[in-house]
From Swiss-Prot:
GO molecular function: 2-succinyl-5-enolpyruvyl-6-hydroxy-3-cyclohexene-1-carboxylic-acid synthase activity; magnesium ion binding; manganese ion binding; thiamine pyrophosphate binding
Class of this enzyme: transferase
Any GO BP: menaquinone biosynthetic process
Protein name: 2-succinyl-5-enolpyruvyl-6-hydroxy-3-cyclohexene-1-carboxylate synthase
HAMAP family: MenD (MF_01659)
Reactions accelerated catalytically: isochorismate + 2-oxoglutarate + H(+) = 5-enolpyruvoyl-6-hydroxy-2-succinyl-cyclohex-3-ene-1-carboxylate + CO2
Biological function: Catalyzes the thiamine diphosphate-dependent decarboxylation of 2-oxoglutarate and the subsequent addition of the resulting succinic semialdehyde-thiamine pyrophosphate anion to isochorismate to yield 2-succinyl-5-enolpyruvyl-6-hydroxy-3-cyclohexene-1-carboxylate (SEPHCHC).
Length: 557
């Protein structure tokens, strides 16, 4: 019996079954125990293989690929702590809905809990975070091929959002053997190998998303909140809300064009709050809201009806409003609930928004600062490109001070909102679309995922990584952290420059000293091509202080 050959046949069938469910990208880390999966992936012409030496970054690379492609993406890792490194990406996918298939190679059962090398208890290691978990048996020809393929089909049918963990034990030997062995085992599936469909096709129940009383509510005073959604959905929602005459408060990830910009500033204005209090219904599309003032208003508002529309199941409303949780893609809901052209009922908000935007423009006009970069970020975006926004302070500054174009693709990891894996995720987004990409992160985020520069340097289109170096986690300057301990225990300044990091990975590098230089250097990157790290050094707490000052000033306009 050739164990190594049957391991590979088993793995080949597993991967072929996944490809029938839309898996095209597969991310692979080095390892011996995962050899059957790796060789099967390399031999499958339907799969595009990506490699990385760091499993944590590999998981986030897959996350980025899944975000931008909207298709499930598979990951192959070896046994032991290699598998555990996928945890952060799995958690993020569970919160933001990307479909990840984690194929964790494992030792066979007789090598667990006996002191064998690189052997840990992997079944169930991710607790409740996977949507579906499978612990496959050791490959054996005694198990029909139809069982394996239908098991994968059944699991994928359940995977609407989040992760699928497939634990794959393989016994040695892992290499060599006559490739013709066990061909009869695979042949039992007949002409399925020439087909392109799953072995077991399961229909999904269609949710009832139409609201019978919509014709009544669309005549009332409504407010639209736009959270995370696709670029197409954001553009469609903006047009829908404008036709309806309802004010739209757009998050930085909404891709709606934020028709009422600087919302996280003017929402602090008492006059704006009085107008919004007249709303009879609030419709929130998408989750993961960023702005503090928006979250405060969202928590305090008391309309007669609060509807939340998102394709991801779950409550998604930390304020626990009484209302309706509608599980539906945004575009499908809008198509089933047409707008009726009406005169805007809250025109005063346009004035407050324009005043806030003008005040920000005047206050930041002569600055080269973190806040100024956030305010003018739209000027740096590549044509027909995309934007990846980091977490912590920079995303809040862009949300509060910037205005991004409607329908322009924006990606981020705003589920668990960690700073781990941001560069790797951005690399995955770029690979999935092959578009020019601007990514912007803070210095600690860049340090946290520094080896992902090895992924970014393989970008297929012009890519610019903007590192806003404010020397530490300056978001803590926005919080009432103990002043005496703030730098040591919260901000943790590292006093680094990224010039040598860029050189180590063969990236272009520049450090502009003015807004004009920044614009010129970014424009050159789009023309020249390649990958460039642009470091923007700013005073440590200036960004946080500027945001606080602008909130106070706009509230008094």
């Amino acid at each position: 019996m050739s164990t190594s050959v049957f391991n590979r046949r088993w793995a080949a069938l597993l991967l072929e079954a996944l490809s029938r469910h839309g898996v095209q990208h597969i991310c692979i880390a080095p390892g011996s125990r995962s050899t059957p999966l790796t060789l099967a992936a390399a031999a499958n012409p339907s799969l595009v293989c990506h490699t990385h030496f760091d499993e944590r970054g590999l998981g986030h690379l897959a996350l980025g690929l899944a975000k931008a492609s909207t298709e499930p993406v598979a990951v192959i890792v070896t046994s032991g702590t290699a598998a555990a490194n996928l945890y952060p990406a799995l958690i993020e996918a569970g919160l933001t809905g990307e479909r990840l298939i984690l194929l964790t190679a494992d030792r066979p059962p007789e090598l667990i809990d006996c002191g064998a090398n690189q052997a840990i208890r992997q079944p169930g290691m991710f607790a409740s975070h996977p949507t579906v978990s499978l612990n496959l048996p050791r490959p054996t020809p005694d198990i029909p091929a139809s069982w394996l393929v239908s098991t994968i089909d059944s699991a994928m049918a359940q995977l609407h959002h989040g992760g699928l963990h497939v634990n794959c034990p393989f016994a040695e030997p892992l290499y060599g053997g006559d490739e013709q062995c066990y061909a009869d085992w695979s042949a039992t599936l007949g002409d399925w190998w020439q087909d392109c469909h799953p072995w077991l096709r399961q229909s999904r129940p269609l949710p009832q998303i139409e609201q019978a009383d919509w014709l009544f509510w669309r005549q009332k005073r409504g407010v639209v909140i736009a959270g995370r959604m696709t670029a197409e959905e954001g553009e469609q929602l903006a047009q829908w809300a404008e036709l309806l005459g309802w004010p739209l408060i757009g998050d930085v990830l909404s891709q709606t064009g934020q028709p009422l910009p600087c919302a996280d500033l003017w929402l602090a204005h008492p006059g704006a709050q009085r107008v919004l209090a007249q709303a009879q219904i609030v419709l929130q599309f998408g989750s993961s809201l960023t702005g503090k003032r928006l979250l405060q208003w969202q928590a305090q508002c008391q309309p007669q009806e609060y509807w939340l529309v998102d394709s991801i199941a779950g409550r998604l409303d930390p304020a626990n409003h009484r209302g309706r949780r509608i599980i539906s893609p945004v575009n499908e809901w809008l198509e089933q609930h047409p707008a009726l052209r009406r005169t805007p009922w809250a025109s005063e908000l346009i004035i407050w928004s324009e005043n806030a935007h003008a005040h920000v423009e005047q206050a930041l006009n002569e600055q080269f600062s973190e806040a100024a970069v956030a305010h003018r970020l739209a000027e740096l975006l590549p044509e027909n490109g995309q934007l990846f926004v980091g977490n912590s302070l920079i995303v809040r500054l862009i949300d509060a001070l910037g205005q991004l174009p409607a329908g322009y693709p924006v990606y981020s990891n705003r589920g668990a909102s960690g700073i781990d894996g941001l560069l790797s995720t951005a690399a995955g987004v770029q690979r999935a679309t092959a578009k020019p990409t601007l990514a912007i992160v803070g210095d600690l985020s860049a340090l946290y995922d520094l080896n992902a520069l090895a992924l970014l340097r393989q970008s297929s289109a012009p890519t610019v990584l903007l590192v806003v170096n404010n020397n530490g986690g300056q978001i803590f300057s926005l919080l009432p952290t103990p002043e005496a301990d703030r730098q040591r225990f919260y901000c943790m300044p590292q006093n680094v420059s990224f010039e040598h990091a860029a050189a180590m990975f063969g990236l272009g590098y520049s450090r502009p000293e003015s807004g004009l230089m920044l614009k010129q250097q970014v424009d050159q990157c789009w023309l020249r091509g390649g990958v460039t790290l642009i470091e923007i050094e700013v005073p440590p707490s200036q960004g946080a202080e500027t945001l606080q000052q602008l909130v106070q000033q706009v509230a008094q306009l």
